[in-house]
Every structure is written in structure tokens, then in C-alpha cells.
């Protein structure tokens, strides 16, 4: 995502940037993300020019697009979306999403959506993992080329983004919720400053 932040817009927006190798991958709240061999790591740079509450909806757009893309390779019933930005495969974490934004005033002028996917086999010995990592290849026995997955994901993101623009966020929320993990259960949500516990509805 560091490279994506320095993108000067020469090739327009939105624009995908893919890393063939990551050395400082990270997740929410500064957590490390172990990028295993054959893993997919890419960022989408956008200029939404909208309030932060609207820009944040792209987290759900990305999650829905990511699940759609993964469902091409594995049984869709094995995939669920975990609040706020992970995708689980057979109960293990296969993908994560990270949003970073900047802007002036109340508007977000630039939004970077970082996406990491274990396309190969799951990394080993991941400390303090809430959900054990799983790789797509653990189920399929084959590693999807990162270039191929980018084409699939970019097409799915464009389709879900179009749905957001044309039909509104309610439709995106409905799609996300239909595949949400732990719906109706007690969950704990943590931010940089606070921890909230309650029923996930």
C-alpha cells in the first residue's frame, strides 16, 4: 500500500497496483499480515471525492467483490465474510481488506483499498491469529496465478461498484449480510480507542 499511496495518477483513477512480493504487509490497527509465497497483494487507488461515511462503503464493495472472485475457484458455501473486512474459507482466514484514506475537510479525496489473499498454501506459524490462516490451494491443490486473480477481482469490483452507484448501499449491505459470519451472535468490535461488545445484527 505504500507504493499505492505514492501513485501520481498518471494512468488515471481508479487504478490497480499489484505487488509480486511484499516485505512489510500489514492489516488493521498496524497488525502484521504474513504474505506467503504465491499470495495475492494488490491495492486499488480511487478518488471518491465524497464524505468519509460514503467512502467507507467501499470496504463492503471490496468484500463482496472478493467473495465473488473466490467463489469462482471454491464452493461458495465455504466462504463467509467476517466483520469488518475479512473473508473466511472453511472457517479460516483466506483474505483481508485494508482501507486508507486522505482528504481535506470532511471529504475523502483519495482512497486506497489494499487486498491480500492466500492464493497458495496457508502460511505456517502465524502468532496471535484470531482465525487460523487458510490458503486457496489447501482446498484446490492448485495455486491461481496472481495476474489471473487480479483480472477476475477487478471485474467483480467494477460490477459491485456499478451496483452501488445504480442501486445504492442497501443492496450492497444485503449482499454482504447474506454471507456474514456470526450473524445473530455476540461479537467484540475493537477500534484504536474503544472496544464494543454486542449482538451482530
Residue ranges, per PLM feature:
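N-terminal lobe of the biotin/lipoate ligase/transferase fold
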Residues: 1-76, 143
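Long, positively charged amphipathic alpha-helical accessory segments at protein N-termini or as interdomain linkers
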Residues: 2, 52, 56-78, 89-201
Amino acid at each position: 500500500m505504500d507504493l499505492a499511496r505514492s501513485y501520481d495518477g498518471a494512468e488515471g483513477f481508479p487504478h490497480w497496483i499489484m505487488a509480486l512480493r511484499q516485505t512489510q504487509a500489514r492489516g488493521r490497527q498496524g497488525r502484521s499480515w504474513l504474505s506467503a509465497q504465491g499470495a495475492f497483494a494488490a491495492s486499488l487507488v480511487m478518488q471518491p471525492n465524497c464524505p468519509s461515511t460514503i467512502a467507507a462503503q467501499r470496504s463492503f464493495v471490496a468484500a463482496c467483490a472478493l467473495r465473488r472472485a473466490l467463489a469462482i475457484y471454491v464452493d461458495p458455501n465455504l466462504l463467509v465474510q467476517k466483520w469488518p473486512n475479512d473473508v473466511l474459507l472453511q472457517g479460516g482466514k483466506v483474505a483481508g481488506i485494508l482501507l486508507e484514506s486522505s482528504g481535506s475537510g470532511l471529504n475523502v479525496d483519495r482512497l486506497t483499498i489494499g487486498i491480500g489473499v492466500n492464493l497458495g498454501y496457508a502460511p505456517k506459524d502465524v502468532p496471535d491469529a484470531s482465525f487460523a490462516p487458510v490458503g486457496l490451494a489447501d482446498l484446490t491443490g492448485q495455486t491461481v496465478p496472481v495476474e489471473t486473480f487480479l483480472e477476475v477481482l477487478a471485474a467483480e469490483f467494477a460490477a459491485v461498484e456499478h451496483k452501488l452507484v445504480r442501486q445504492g448501499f442497501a443492496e450492497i449491505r444485503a449482499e454482504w449480510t447474506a454471507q456474514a459470519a456470526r450473524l445473530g451472535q455476540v461479537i467484540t468490535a475493537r477500534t484504536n480507542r474503544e472496544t464494543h461488545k454486542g449482538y451482530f445484527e
